[in-house]
Amino acid sequence: MARFHNPAERPYKLPDLCTTLDTTLQDITIACVYCRRPLQQTEVYEFAFSDLYVVYRDGEPLAACQSCIKFYAKIRELRYYSDSVYATTLENITNTKLYNLLIRCMCCLKPLCPAEKLRHLNSKRRFHKIAGSYTGQCRRCWTTKREDRRLTRRETQV
């Protein structure tokens, strides 16, 4: 992997890094900033799709694997949780329509699409302010957590 010593020349998004290195998302090899193991191809796509930033340590570009993203997202939630608000309240607080707000998933840090934001609104679920940014749950994490709760409930019933 090439090293970027000049901060002005560093690409901070994974597709831009691929363009700079003249490679593709399929062929890029990049390590996790937390555990230092190379990302699998599915994790590379997830990182690019999540629109997260590439970070640099000693000029070397690093990303984050899915297990580390979920682990550190939970730590971030536990350390920096501030409050929870409904979608209409969030629009009033920010004076911005829900559609125009950048809201990430609190579990996997993927930006929520308009349908996922609307799902929060219709099912009266709250958005949570964590580390100064509002978060919700994407479709995948919403259903995964729901399945986990259902399994736990069955295990505890006698």
Swiss-Prot record:
One of its GO terms (molecular function) is PDZ domain binding. It is found in: Host cytoplasm; Host nucleus. This is Protein E6. Forms homodimers. Interacts with ubiquitin-protein ligase UBE3A/E6-AP and thus forms a complex with human TP53. Interacts with human NFX1 and MAGI3. Interacts with human IRF3; this interaction inhibits the establishment of antiviral state. Interacts with human TYK2; this interaction inhibits JAK-STAT activation by interferon alpha. Interacts with host DLG1; this interaction leads to the proteasomal degradation of DLG1. Disulfide bonds: none annotated. Belongs to the high risk human alphapapillomavirus family. The cancer-causing human papillomavirus E6 protein has a unique carboxy terminal PDZ domain containing substrate. This protein may be involved in the oncogenic potential of this virus (cervical neoplasia-associated virus). Plays a major role in the induction and maintenance of cellular transformation. Acts mainly as an oncoprotein by stimulating the destruction of many host cell key regulatory proteins. E6 associates with host UBE3A/E6-AP ubiquitin-protein ligase, and inactivates tumor suppressors TP53 and TP73 by targeting them to the 26S proteasome for degradation. In turn, DNA damage and chromosomal instabilities increase and lead to cell proliferation and cancer development. A motif (PDZ-binding domain) lies at residues 156-158. One of its GO terms (biological process) is symbiont-mediated suppression of host cytoplasmic pattern recognition receptor signaling pathway via inhibition of IRF3 activity. A zinc finger (unnamed) spans 32-68, 105-141. Its main location: host cell. It holds the Pfam family E6.
